[in-house]
């Protein structure tokens, strides 16, 4: 299946179970720590990198048990001292805290196995997470797809596999849930169907680990063979099958801003996922995009409510900035090593325009069409025109592969070879790749 053509399927019915990788569980900790005068850095916990860090998430159809499984993982690992238990209600409601009038999402789960440190996300209801998944800004290193033994594969099972493939997830582990409610023959049938589906969407269906169990039994401490033991087998499979991602740590630092928070008397915090490079506390950085070019110093770094001496590629972290006001910053700006990135407003890109059947436009469009462009965490209006002025009356039709000139209403940091998506009215118009910078 052409993954570009399949992109729009990701957005059909993808509501409640969006996973939001870049949202900030640590932000409340940042604000609380940096604003309590009695506390000093010496009092705070330090994040120690004893194990490789991997970003993971649960995906799958609504009500198949993703959140219950996430809670069960934290419960089973908490008994080993490798996690803090979070029950279903803590995860499902995506709890928010207000600090100085700022609403902060905090449904990000942290845990460890014997071999790795994991950031696991399961945040139902965050509609804006779709934007991150479109652009690949919140790419997971691996995923657990949950499928109910009572239903088998369902529409969102397929959609989420497409989503995972589109954002670059190469390895997935399957958890067949609710096995206590069906006969063994049904479990075998679901496993066979899942292997076929994985192969259909470009995964290794023959060798993908499939674990059967009951997340609810594990959570409630019942029937250990399908409860606790299944969680143990699942995490062993995740450890062994999902390879450690290669992080680009020896290149200049870059992080797209996801959120911005103001801390009175201390500075401003920006949060996001480090795309590449390494950043040490005390380093000078530039913030670029939307016509702004700011310079400042990083006075603090935190992840999972713990201090970091340095942020590296793959980290979901918060940066405390000196002498920068919240009003100067916005989502979509880029934090980077000074002199390494530049904003652009005009470039050439190679497009695939989705068809009506794929959820795209029903009709074509002509020159000066103005949809929204999503790149990393940026969201900006773009005007599309043909490279050859003689083609200005030529209509671009759904299903076309075409080169277009993109002109943004505001400059953003965008690079040759970078992928992006254009959308209109809540649906995806096309996917594209930057082929040439024109300014």
Curated annotation (Swiss-Prot):
GO cellular component, one term: mitochondrial matrix
Coiled-coil zones: none
G5, as annotated region: 214-216
Residue span of region G1: 60-67
Region G3, annotated ranges: 122-125
Subcellular locations according to the entry: Mitochondrion
Ranges of residues in domain tr-type G: 51-246
Keywords assigned by UniProt, alphabetized: Elongation factor, GTP-binding, Mitochondrion, Nucleotide-binding, Protein biosynthesis, Transit peptide
GO MF annotation, one: GTP binding
Presence of the UniProt keyword Protein biosynthesis in the record: yes
Annotated PANTHER family: ELONGATION FACTOR TU, MITOCHONDRIAL, ELONGATION FACTOR TU-RELATED
Protein family (similarity comment): Belongs to the TRAFAC class translation factor GTPase superfamily. Classic translation factor GTPase family. EF-Tu/EF-1A subfamily.
NCBIfam families: EF-Tu (TIGR00485), PRK00049.1 (NF000766), PRK12735.1 (NF009372), PRK12736.1 (NF009373), small_GTP (TIGR00231)
Function: This protein promotes the GTP-dependent binding of aminoacyl-tRNA to the A-site of ribosomes during protein biosynthesis.
Name of the protein in its database record: Elongation factor Tu, mitochondrial
Species per Swiss-Prot/TrEMBL record: Schizosaccharomyces pombe (strain 972 / ATCC 24843) (Fission yeast)
